[in-house]
């Protein structure tokens, strides 16, 4: 694989602290810079142009840009008043009833001079981790200060937010980012940071990130700090996950019903110290994205991997279980041939 060294620079980041974590250094500033979830982002663009912000809930998996999107929207709406008119709180750290009564209520009461049609914004991250009592108190504050303050919530599961709050908000949903979206962003970062990389190295980072941009940038920076060169071997060492090439080899051999050849690869991963969950998760991810297996066979593979994962999560996570999984996959392939 050819190693690429990039030399391009980006004027937007040249004045930033070089020691700043890349996940913060490359956090979007404008709504148009947000990666992925185009439909939801376009709705945020419309809100920023219209200027009338409702209370909103953005739900979705970690690392998909929920909080960054809210911050971009707040900047677009408030401009120079951003610092004094925005209050950001991570509800997973400060989620008690006292925090709602003291910090949030005091900011909601605070008088800030804003242009007509603009409101103060309270941003609560991971609000789904707040206690029910704190959420009830929050609902009351939303009612009392609705004329001056808007609330923007980010969460992983909107179902954990009480119904009275949900009914007062517009709910927007984010999904995991696609591999191509993450790859595009990674290429931009390695160009700016002048990081030497190989294509298989970026592919390994995408594989370990599983649609999480924050995880992808953290893994990229950690690999660069530890080894300099971004290649598959170095990424695997840093992320401590089963090597994708070994997993692909296991799946390919099982697709050929070749248990005898597949088992040594599995045994090597086990001897290297990887847990059953590590190996099963890697098998699932690689199988799901494989284009070398017929669709029906892929579905049967995923079903057997899912059953094995169920047993592993209930405590039956031995090498025997993984060996049994290989035999099941090989049996599926034999049935397909017949």
UniProtKB/Swiss-Prot annotation:
<dbReference type="GO" id="GO:0005663">
    <property type="term" value="C:DNA replication factor C complex"/>
</dbReference>
<dbReference type="InterPro" id="IPR003593">
    <property type="entry name" value="AAA+_ATPase"/>
</dbReference>
<dbReference type="InterPro" id="IPR027417">
    <property type="entry name" value="P-loop_NTPase"/>
</dbReference>
<dbReference type="GO" id="GO:0006261">
    <property type="term" value="P:DNA-templated DNA replication"/>
</dbReference>
<keyword id="KW-0067">ATP-binding</keyword>
<dbReference type="GO" id="GO:0006281">
    <property type="term" value="P:DNA repair"/>
</dbReference>
<dbReference type="GO" id="GO:0016887">
    <property type="term" value="F:ATP hydrolysis activity"/>
</dbReference>
<dbReference type="InterPro" id="IPR013748">
    <property type="entry name" value="Rep_factorC_C"/>
</dbReference>
<comment type="function">
    <text>The elongation of primed DNA templates by DNA polymerase delta and epsilon requires the action of the accessory proteins PCNA and activator 1.</text>
</comment>
<dbReference type="InterPro" id="IPR050238">
    <property type="entry name" value="DNA_Rep/Repair_Clamp_Loader"/>
</dbReference>
<dbReference type="GO" id="GO:0005634">
    <property type="term" value="C:nucleus"/>
</dbReference>
<dbReference type="InterPro" id="IPR003959">
    <property type="entry name" value="ATPase_AAA_core"/>
</dbReference>
<comment type="similarity">
    <text>Belongs to the activator 1 small subunits family.</text>
</comment>
<dbReference type="GO" id="GO:0031391">
    <property type="term" value="C:Elg1 RFC-like complex"/>
</dbReference>
<keyword id="KW-0235">DNA replication</keyword>
<dbReference type="Pfam" id="PF00004">
    <property type="entry name" value="AAA"/>
</dbReference>
<dbReference type="GO" id="GO:0003677">
    <property type="term" value="F:DNA binding"/>
</dbReference>
<keyword id="KW-0547">Nucleotide-binding</keyword>
<dbReference type="GO" id="GO:0005524">
    <property type="term" value="F:ATP binding"/>
</dbReference>
<dbReference type="InterPro" id="IPR047854">
    <property type="entry name" value="RFC_lid"/>
</dbReference>
<dbReference type="GO" id="GO:0006272">
    <property type="term" value="P:leading strand elongation"/>
</dbReference>
<dbReference type="GO" id="GO:0003689">
    <property type="term" value="F:DNA clamp loader activity"/>
</dbReference>
<protein>
    <recommendedName>
        <fullName>Probable replication factor C subunit 2</fullName>
    </recommendedName>
</protein>
<dbReference type="InterPro" id="IPR008921">
    <property type="entry name" value="DNA_pol3_clamp-load_cplx_C"/>
</dbReference>
<comment type="subunit">
    <text>Heteropentamer of various rfc subunits that forms a complex (RFC) with PCNA in the presence of ATP.</text>
</comment>
<keyword id="KW-0539">Nucleus</keyword>
<dbReference type="Pfam" id="PF08542">
    <property type="entry name" value="Rep_fac_C"/>
</dbReference>
<feature type="binding site">
    <location>
        <begin position="60"/>
        <end position="67"/>
    </location>
    <ligand>
        <name>ATP</name>
    </ligand>
</feature>
């Amino acid at each position: 694989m050819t190693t690429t060294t990039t030399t391009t620079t980006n004027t937007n980041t040249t004045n930033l602290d070089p020691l700043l974590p890349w996940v913060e250094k490359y956090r979007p500033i404008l709504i148009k810079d947000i990666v992925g979830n185009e439909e939801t982002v376009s709705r945020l663009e419309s809100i920023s142009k219209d200027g009338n912000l409702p209370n909103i809930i953005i739900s979705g998996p970690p690392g998909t840009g929920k909080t960054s999107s809210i911050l971009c929207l707040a900047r677009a709406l408030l401009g120079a008043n951003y610092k004094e008119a925005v209050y950001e709180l991570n509800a997973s750290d400060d989620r008690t009833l006292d925090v709602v009564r003291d910090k949030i209520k005091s900011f909601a009461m605070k008088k800030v001079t804003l242009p007509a049609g603009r409101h103060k914004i309270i941003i609560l991250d991971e609000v789904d981790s707040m206690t029910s009592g704190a959420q009830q108190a929050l609902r009351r504050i939303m009612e009392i200060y609705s004329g001056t303050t808007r609330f923007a919530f980010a969460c992983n599961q909107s179902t954990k937010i009480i119904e009275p709050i949900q009914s007062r908000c517009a709910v927007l949903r984010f999904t995991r980012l696609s591999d191509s979206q993450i790859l595009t962003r990674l290429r931009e970062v390695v160009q700016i940071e002048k990081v030497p990389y190989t294509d298989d190295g970026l592919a390994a980072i995408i594989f370990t990130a599983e649609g999480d941009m924050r995880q992808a940038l953290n893994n990229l920076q950690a690999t660069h700090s530890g080894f300099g060169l971004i290649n598959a071997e170095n990424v695997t060492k840093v992320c401590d996950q089963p090597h994708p090439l070994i997993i692909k080899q296991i799946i390919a051999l099982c697709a050929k019903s070749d248990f005898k050849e597949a088992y040594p690869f599995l045994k090597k991963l086990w001897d290297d110290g990887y847990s059953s969950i590590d190996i099963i998760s890697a098998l699932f991810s690689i199988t799901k994205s494989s284009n070398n297996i017929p669709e029906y066979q892929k579905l049967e593979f995923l079903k057997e991997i899912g059953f094995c994962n169920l047993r592993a999560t209930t405590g039956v996570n031995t090498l025997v279980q993984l060996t049994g999984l290989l035999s099941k996959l090989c049996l599926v392939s034999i049935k397909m041939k017949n």
